[in-house]
């Protein structure tokens, strides 16, 4: 039993560390490694659920063109989740990452109006349009492949705002994901959250970027427009910091790993490299016989 628990915990760590867009590959590898005990994979349900909720897995419902987020903030329990913008709920298979059983679901509660306002939806009858800036235009402008969601949380006392953008390019051996999570408290105007980037590059090697930045600020207006504006400021600042970090790595640490000159302390004349005689020209003199 001790060995089984140890093996299960190890396999769960594989699931937890699955790179963006590669959960199916990790599951296939786990099955290959546990052929002697195939029952272990069936015990990974909680690990799959934790992974999908933390990674903000996305899924498309039948007939829908917009991806929907799976998270603990949108959970209804028993494997069902809901989406505010499409007013629907669905069942989610965490192992296959497929949705089924879509049903109508209308959000109600103390923060329902603010939630709709952030999304830019009309909350009253008629043709009145929200005067608040919507989250949708911001996401579409800054993220080419993204999903977003706004959910009441903590007994309707706060609002959770989630943005997730995925970029998968397995043919070029890389995949990446951006995750934003904000918790807004209408009573204090506090906006707390985190920004996370996860990129995996695996051509002729295995390199992974995992970075996170906490966000803490106060919004005086407390409107949807004010919230989206502050989100935009925070994410632009983080993007600028990442760009500066990449430039610093390229011009600093990575450059320091390369020799400025060969061991001979002489630069190679690349236009004449075809005529070099190894050990003589590169060695700086006549080769010994």
How does the language model describe each region?
Residues 1-4:
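Short, Lys/Arg-enriched N-terminal segments with co-localized hydrophobic residues
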Residues 27-28, 34, 130, 203, ...:
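General structural signal for secondary-structure boundaries
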Residues 7, 197-199, 274:
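Short, isolated positions within intrinsically disordered regulatory regions of eukaryotic proteins
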Residues 89-90, 129, 133, 137, ...:
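Surface-exposed short loop/turn segments
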């Amino acid at each position: 039993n001790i060995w089984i628990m140890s093996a299960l915990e190890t396999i769960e760590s594989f699931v937890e560390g699955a790179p963006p867009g590669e959960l199916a590959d990790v599951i296939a590898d786990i099955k290959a490694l546990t052929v002697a005990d195939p029952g272990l994979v069936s015990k990974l349900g909680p690990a799959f659920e934790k992974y999908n909720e933390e990674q903000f897995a996305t899924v498309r419902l039948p007939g829908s063109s917009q991806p929907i987020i799976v998270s603990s903030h949108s959970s209804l329990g028993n494997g069902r989740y809901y989406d505010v913008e499409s007013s629907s709920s669905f069942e989610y298979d965490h192992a296959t990452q497929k949705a089924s059983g879509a049903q109508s679901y209308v959000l109600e509660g103390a923060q329902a109006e603010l939630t709709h306002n952030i999304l830019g939806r009309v909350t009253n009858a008629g043709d009145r349009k929200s005067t608040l800036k919507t989250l949708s235009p911001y996401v579409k402008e800054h993220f080419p492949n993204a999903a977003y969601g706004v959910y009441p949380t903590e007994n309707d006392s706060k609002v959770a705002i989630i943005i997730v953008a995925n970029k998968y390019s397995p043919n070029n051996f890389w995949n990446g994901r951006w995750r934003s999570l904000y918790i807004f408290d209408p009573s204090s105007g506090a906006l707390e959250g985190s920004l996370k980037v996860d990129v995996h590059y695996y051509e002729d090697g295995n390199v992974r970027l995992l970075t996170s930045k906490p966000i803490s600020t106060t919004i005086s207006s407390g409107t949807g427009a004010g919230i989206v504006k502050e989100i935009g400021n925070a994410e632009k600042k983080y993007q600028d910091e990442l760009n500066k970090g990449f430039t610093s790595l390229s011009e600093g640490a990575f450059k320091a790993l390369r020799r400025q000159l060969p061991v001979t302390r002489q630069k190679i004349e690349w236009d004449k490299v075809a005529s070099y005689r190894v050990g003589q020209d590169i060695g700086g003199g006549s080769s010994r016989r």
